[in-house]
Amino acid sequence: MLKNSFFSIILKEQEENKENRGSVEFQVVSFTNKIRKLTSHLELHKKDYLSQRGLRKILGKRQRLLAYLSKKNRARYKELIGQLDIRERKTR
């Protein structure tokens, strides 16, 4: 639960900047929170296939946003990945 409280703190920091809600970082943080909640839900309900599909869709959206951010600003990408404690995307 320590991770969840950490992410809510990051989310509150970014919510204070009302004009920043459309930023890539804010969207990635909110998608990460949704992913964590869905993952914990799916640990209890293994056969909830609709939630599995929703999780895959959110993962794809976050992956596309992170790819965009890594192309546009590599430093912000590295900082965000470090804050959220997620793996760097694979490159081909």
From Swiss-Prot:
<dbReference type="GO" id="GO:0006412">
    <property type="term" value="P:translation"/>
</dbReference>
<dbReference type="InterPro" id="IPR009068">
    <property type="entry name" value="uS15_NS1_RNA-bd_sf"/>
</dbReference>
<dbReference type="Pfam" id="PF00312">
    <property type="entry name" value="Ribosomal_S15"/>
</dbReference>
<dbReference type="GO" id="GO:0005840">
    <property type="term" value="C:ribosome"/>
</dbReference>
<comment type="subunit">
    <text>Part of the 30S ribosomal subunit.</text>
</comment>
<dbReference type="InterPro" id="IPR000589">
    <property type="entry name" value="Ribosomal_uS15"/>
</dbReference>
<keyword id="KW-0934">Plastid</keyword>
<dbReference type="GO" id="GO:0009507">
    <property type="term" value="C:chloroplast"/>
</dbReference>
<comment type="similarity">
    <text>Belongs to the universal ribosomal protein uS15 family.</text>
</comment>
<keyword id="KW-0689">Ribosomal protein</keyword>
<protein>
    <recommendedName>
        <fullName>Small ribosomal subunit protein uS15c</fullName>
    </recommendedName>
</protein>
<dbReference type="GO" id="GO:1990904">
    <property type="term" value="C:ribonucleoprotein complex"/>
</dbReference>
<dbReference type="InterPro" id="IPR005290">
    <property type="entry name" value="Ribosomal_uS15_bac-type"/>
</dbReference>
<keyword id="KW-0150">Chloroplast</keyword>
<dbReference type="GO" id="GO:0003735">
    <property type="term" value="F:structural constituent of ribosome"/>
</dbReference>
<keyword id="KW-0687">Ribonucleoprotein</keyword>
